[in-house]
Amino acid sequence: MATALVLGYSAFDLGLFSDKDPRLKLIKKAIRKDLEAMAADGVSWLVFTGSLGFEYWVLEVAQEMKTEYGFQLATIFAFETHGENWNEGNQMKLSRFKQVDFVKYAYPRYEHKGQLRDYQQFLLENTTSSYLFYDEENETKLAYFYQKMKNQEDYFIKRLTFDQLNELAENFSEN
């Protein structure tokens, strides 16, 4: 059973503040293409942390593909309090993360930074790969976790990059 941890830029990181942003269509097209390849490579479980942006868009696409590709979806939140202060629209998105095949919380609430380190280590040890929208030239808080992934032995990282999106956009506009 191959499992992929899904992580990537937040909508804020990308400057995408509307679900109707035309760039989302292109991002979701790239996600669909990547998920098809991952399914062909034997990935059956997609593991989310409940973050808005890339993770949520992958969740949306994976739910559309679930029946055809047999994906199982899991959300492992760091804390039970995750998203409790989000606005109503984001609460709706959070509820989709909670309506998957498997949901767990690592901790009741944040108490110290060691929890996040242990949570990240748990995610790495319990997945065989990751699907990551991250570009080293556009660093965010994912930089540390990305380094840990690269240092994890026998851990495959499938990346979506801005270059890939630009190439897809060029091909998309030519058709």
Swiss-Prot record:
SUPFAM superfamilies per the record?
Answer: MCP/YpsA-like (SSF102405)
One Pfam family from the UniProt entry? YpsA
Q: Which PANTHER family match?
A: UPF0398 PROTEIN SPR0331, UPF0398 PROTEIN YPSA
The entry sums up its family as follows: Belongs to the UPF0398 family.
| Designated name of the protein | UPF0398 protein SPD_0338
